[in-house]
């Protein structure tokens, strides 16, 4: 069920240049699932459209959820100035999220993230670990300064970090690491830039439990405006799915990334 609630800002901090981590508190948290997102209304009357931001962590006991976002334009810049005690008009939780019911204790999951696509993998990793699943994360960034959330993922399993320029971790891309694995994961969960998702979609196209979480510009966020559609593969007629409703998570091989 999609709700609208004024969530309270518990804390906010900059964890990397232009990347902020905000903790929100409210009753809505009880309905949140890993891989979903919230739609935030910027506290400025001139900003009409909400901002979709993925949920990074969920603490059901405290009724707190953590989001991580990058300051891109004026709207997110305004969000970055919010402080503890302020409230923000929030619609959510939205989207289908990651399905971890298909993997069992003792099996192995591969998490693949790039840049600001890494945050939703944190709660996924935590819940997989709690389930007894072996978690391996491969995360890619432009450079050392852009690396985020490595410590939280490392608390859940092995982590490989790549940077485009080699300033931290392994020089290259997530594919540089994954293509050298001599094992096949029982499930794959990914979120990141289109180029990275194209790689995951191709690499694991025929995998029965591989998923890509897609980003898209949204307007209404409720499936009515069709501003966030993606195209279904193999359809002769134009068939679209909405990232905000049928997504943001899709099985590999399902949609054109």
Curated annotation (Swiss-Prot):
The keyword Methyltransferase does not apply. Keywords: 2Fe-2S, Electron transport, FAD, Flavoprotein, Iron, Iron-sulfur, Metal-binding, Pyrimidine biosynthesis, Transport. Its cofactor is [2Fe-2S] cluster; FAD. Pathway: Pyrimidine metabolism; UMP biosynthesis via de novo pathway; orotate from (S)-dihydroorotate (NAD(+) route): step 1/1. The keyword Iron-sulfur applies. It holds the Pfam family DHODB_Fe-S_bind. [2Fe-2S] cluster binds at residues 220, 225, 228, 244. Coiled coil: none annotated. One of its GO terms (biological process) is 'de novo' UMP biosynthetic process. Residues 2-100 form the FAD-binding FR-type domain. CDD domains: DHOD_e_trans. Binds 1 [2Fe-2S] cluster per subunit. GO terms for molecular function: 2 iron, 2 sulfur cluster binding; electron transfer activity; flavin adenine dinucleotide binding; metal ion binding; oxidoreductase activity. FAD binds at residues 51-54, 68-70, 75-76. Responsible for channeling the electrons from the oxidation of dihydroorotate from the FMN redox center in the PyrD type B subunit to the ultimate electron acceptor NAD(+). Belongs to the PyrK family. PANTHER family: DIHYDROOROTATE DEHYDROGENASE B (NAD(+)), ELECTRON TRANSFER SUBUNIT, DIHYDROOROTATE DEHYDROGENASE B (NAD(+)), ELECTRON TRANSFER SUBUNIT-RELATED. HAMAP family: DHODB_Fe_S_bind (MF_01211). This is Dihydroorotate dehydrogenase B (NAD(+)), electron transfer subunit. The gene is pyrK.
């Amino acid at each position: 069920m999609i709700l609208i609630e004024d969530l309270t800002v518990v804390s906010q901090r900059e964890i990397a240049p232009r990347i902020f981590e905000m903790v929100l508190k409210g009753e809505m948290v009880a309905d949140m699932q890993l891989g979903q997102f919230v739609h935030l209304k910027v506290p400025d009357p001139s900003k009409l459209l909400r901002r979709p931001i993925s949920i990074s962590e969920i603490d059901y006991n405290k009724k707190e959820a953590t989001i991580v976002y990058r300051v891109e334009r004026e709207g997110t810049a305004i969000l970055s100035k919010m402080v503890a005690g302020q409230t923000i008009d929030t619609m959510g939780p939205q989207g289908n999220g990651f399905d971890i019911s298909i993997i069992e204790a003792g099996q192995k999951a591969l998490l693949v993230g790039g840049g600001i696509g890494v945050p939703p993998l944190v709660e996924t990793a935590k819940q997989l670990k709690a389930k007894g699943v072996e978690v391996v994360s491969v995360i890619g960034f432009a450079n050392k300064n852009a690396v985020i959330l490595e410590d939280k993922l490392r608390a859940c399993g092995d982590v490989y970090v790549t940077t485009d320029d080699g300033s931290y971790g392994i020089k290259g891309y997530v594919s540089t690491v994954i293509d050298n694995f001599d094992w096949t994961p029982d499930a794959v969960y990914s979120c990141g830039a289109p180029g990275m998702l194209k790689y995951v979609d191709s690499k694991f196209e025929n995998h029965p439990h591989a998923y890509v979480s897609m980003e898209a510009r949204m307007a209404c966020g409720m499936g009515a405006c069709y501003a966030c559609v993606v195209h279904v593969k193999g359809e002769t007629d134009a068939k679209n799915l909405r990232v905000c409703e049928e997504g943001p998570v899709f099985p590999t091989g399902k949609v054109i990334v």
